[in-house]
Amino acid sequence: MALVSRRSTRSESTSITKEEHTGEGSLTKLFFRWLVTLEGDQDINDGKGYISLPNVSNYIFFLGGRFRTVKGAKPLWLGVLLAIVCPMVLFSIFEAHKLWHTQNGYKVLVIFFYYFWVITLASFIRTATSDPGVLPRNIHLSQLRNNYQIPQEYYNLITLPTHSSISKDITIKYCPSCRIWRPPRSSHCSTCNVCVMVHDHHCIWVNNCIGKRNYRFFLIFLLGAILSSVILLTNCAIHIARESGGPRDCPVAILLLCYAGLTLWYPAILFTYHIFMAGNQQTTREFLKGIGSKKNPVFHRVVKEENIYNKGSFLKNMGHLMLEPRGPSFVSARKPHEAGDWRFMDLSPAHSFEKIQKI
């Protein structure tokens, strides 16, 4: 009798779920889930990726998977967004009109400011909300022993053959969290809870990883921020110099001048560092591993080493970075997937060999 009652309860709950998905309430629910997807739905085995990806990652999706961010992290990216938008608003209200109607042809500087500002904002959004190169989960599943024990050989590094005996060895490693053999230069991000191709670092300012598919947008964002600050500084300096009443009559110009001068340096230092790294085909993780330090690599003495990925010249390396295809999105948030797709399944955590031995 208990078994029959359980079956009837399950059938009733299933029918209720089907009714919910076919009623008017389901349309509202689906709309809000499309608008903001905070948690994945365990009851839905198929559908778009943005519905299932939150089950196996720390991502939050917006507008049907078109934008993403990481939950649980400090919202520093909101401060960066305000730092981009607020100067443009103040410049548009108090400065643009006066510079536009001068006799000496300062319209070009106004146009340049808005042009580089748009590039800065667009590249920031692209860097912060796009797929950095997330690798699919549960591709290389081993036959787990008792108590979900991973075989010991899965904790070994595999060295790949290279065409050069001078450069360092290329190794691949098994990720017990994502359960895949990671490709070279890939790494697991504990903040996002995903493995990322050509993982450079997790940037707290954009709340996203910087990897193969968004590194170029990150560089464009830094360059756009630098040029926008320089042009804003120039425009405000011209306004102050041309003001007949002195600096007291243009307080907003002085405010923007100080702001542009202060916000120029950090992006400039960061951009210089990453240009050197990209020009040598080296990631931040590889650089930190080479110097054996976890400190801020921007202020560390540069140590140039042999690199199998180096194309031989700065221009070739930069061209390879900026012009090569970004590669496919292996775990697309907008494409549908079928029921039983293991890439979107949150499997029981496997224990390490060492942990089992202690037990």
Curated annotation (Swiss-Prot):
InterPro entries in the record: Palmitoyltrfase_DHHC, PFA4/ZDH16/20/ERF2-like
Alphabetically ordered keywords of this record: Acyltransferase, Endoplasmic reticulum, Lipoprotein, Membrane, Palmitate, Transferase, Transmembrane, Transmembrane helix
A Pfam family the protein falls into: DHHC
Lumenal side: 97-104, 239-250
Residue numbers on the Cytoplasmic membrane side: 1-75, 126-217, 272-359
Protein purpose: The ERF2-SHR5 complex is a palmitoyltransferase specific for Ras proteins. Palmitoylates RAS2, which is required for its proper plasma membrane localization.
Keyword Transmembrane included in the entry's annotation: yes
Primary location: endoplasmic reticulum
Effect of residue 189 to S: Abolishes palmitoyltransferase activity and interaction with SHR5
Subcellular location: Endoplasmic reticulum membrane
UniProt-reported outcome of changing residue 201 to A: Abolishes palmitoyltransferase activity
Membrane disposition: Multi-pass membrane protein
EC numbers for this chain: 2.3.1.225
Stated name of the protein: Palmitoyltransferase ERF2
Every DHHC domain range: 173-223
Post-translational modifications: Autopalmitoylated.
Summary of subunit composition and partner proteins: Interacts with SHR5.
Originating organism: Saccharomyces cerevisiae (strain ATCC 204508 / S288c) (Baker's yeast)
Location of the region described as Disordered in the Swiss-Prot/TrEMBL record: 1-21
Family per similarity comment: Belongs to the DHHC palmitoyltransferase family. ERF2/ZDHHC9 subfamily.
Residue stretches spanning the membrane: 76-96, 105-125, 218-238, 251-271
Organism domain of life: Eukaryota
Recorded GO CC terms: cortical endoplasmic reticulum; endoplasmic reticulum; endoplasmic reticulum membrane; endoplasmic reticulum palmitoyltransferase complex; Golgi apparatus; perinuclear endoplasmic reticulum
Main enzyme class: transferase
A GO biological process held by the record: protein palmitoylation
Keyword Transmembrane on entry: yes
Molecular function terms from GO: palmitoyltransferase activity; protein-cysteine S-palmitoyltransferase activity
